[in-house]
Amino acid sequence: MEIKNFFRSSSRSVKERKNIIIEEKKKKVVKNYYNFGYDYFDNKNLSFGYGGYKYDGRFKNNVKNIINFFKLSKRLRIAEFGCAKGFVLVEFLKKQFQVIGFEKSKYAIKNCHPLLKKKIINIEKVNQINKYKFDFLICKDVLPSLTEKQIKYLIRTAIKKSKKPPYFIIQTFKNKKNIDFYKNWDKTHVTIKNRKEWIYFLKKFNKKIYYSFNFIF
């Protein structure tokens, strides 16, 4: 079921993103970027990527709104798939929830929020989450970086293990004319769909999950 996005999009406008892509298109993206390393998160010399991802408490109110909407009690264990440095997850921890994070990037885990040093699990494959218990799963801006097979597996597993419907925030684009900009903005994306295509793809899970769209183009 589609709901409003609890997270605002990037501070950059669509026009700014398009201009960045035009300027950066001829530059070579290093392997470290594709492995979600330093260049992906903290290289300020790259116009794409995070360009320096530091904790500033930006997700405090977002998490508060999620807790209220989903009626999450502190007895629940909150999981985040693709938690990066844990800046969303730590806001749940600060509100006395049990938390667990799943992250592919060893760089992100090494540089995660200090309160999460022993709470983020390094995973290489989606099915590794089966080993762990959780009651509610959130997944922000990660699905496009997975294959369709991996996405379906993640959703089915989250539904099976969660006491609350899992929540997915999906980066996408509004129409076909922006597809090339979207592809070039984050080249770690492997599943490319616009809003309409995502809704169709998720139709079979519609009453069992919640999802929102983060339109970057």
Residue ranges of each PLM-predicted region?
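Phosphate-coordination loops involved in phosphoryl transfer and adenosine-cofactor binding
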Residues: 75
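A conserved beta-strand element that flanks and buttresses the S-adenosyl-L-methionine
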Residues: 138
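Short catalytic micro-motifs in class I SAM-dependent methyltransferases
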Residues: 141-145
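Conserved acidic residues
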Residues: 135
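Class I (Rossmann-like) S-adenosyl-L-methionine-dependent methyltransferase catalytic domain
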Residues: 1-70, 79-130, 146-157, 164-217
